[in-house]
Amino acid sequence: MKVAADPDPSLVSQRDMEPEAAKDKDSFRNYTSGPLLDRVFATYKLMHTWQTVDFVRRKHAQFGGFSYKRMTVMEAVDMLDGLVDESDPDVDFPNSFHAFQTAEGIRKAHPDKDWFHLVGLLHDLGKVLALAGEPQWAVVGDTFPVGCRPQASVVFRDCTFQDNPDLQDPLYSTELGMYQPHCGLENVLMSWGHDEYMYRMMKFNKFALPPEAFYIIRFHSFYPWHKFGDYQQLCNEQDLAMLPWVQEFNKFDLYTKSSSLPDVAALRPYYQGLVDKYCPGILCW
């Protein structure tokens, strides 16, 4: 399925995005102050200490068989009623509401792209790992490539990586690390978390979504790349072609966060219809 007819999706959302969603953007992703800062910093300190090449490979092996649980997409959404993301400085309410906020923001700006609406609902479902006993530092937060030196825009980079053993490795501590120039992000080992898990889960269960959807899910938390432009030395032409979709998605992932919670019961039938269309039935997680 190809969805390349609109090469710059931002042209649509700049016109149609709600004013409430666009205001006060500078207040989001504040990693210098705020009531949740201590919790957020502690999560990233653990993440940046223990996310290594060896750790990520072990997690791929542990979860790659998708034998944790069998359930529908909507059952996974309901599970997120019990999760508050400890890496998020912006919200302190269950992640299930954020899923519907994101999806509805996309639906308003892109009414003709129902697959994109569903991506909004799906994007954080990999966080069910935190409800399966995984520590949040191995599930939530911004992602980054392992096996190479963290670049400047990684959150808390200068004060959280001191104890990461990979940074003592003569190869992994270089800018390219274990990668070839412009190898493509599909060939990069990203820090383990809900993005990579959900991407692989969708592939395993053969979701009938376009390539853009899989790409958004896999890299939506890779802020050092899609927001700050770092890690260009690893990117290829496909990454640059997909970047506008990830950036477009990010507007809704980030700027729809609000303490005004959606009426989930009213929205549920519409999204159940999308699930039935693109990823029906009981799935392997």
UniProtKB/Swiss-Prot annotation:
Fe cation 2 binds at D124, H194, H220. Keywords: Cytoplasm, Iron, Metal-binding, Oxidoreductase, Phosphoprotein. Its main location: cytoplasm. The modification Phosphoserine is found at S33. It is found in: Cytoplasm. Substrate binds at R29, D85, E86, S87, K127, G141, D142, H220, S221. Fe cation 1 binds at H98, H123, D124, D253. Residues 15-28 have a biased composition (Basic and acidic residues). GO terms for molecular function: ferric iron binding; inositol oxygenase activity. Binds 2 iron ions per subunit. It holds the Pfam family MIOX. This is Inositol oxygenase. It comes from Bos taurus.
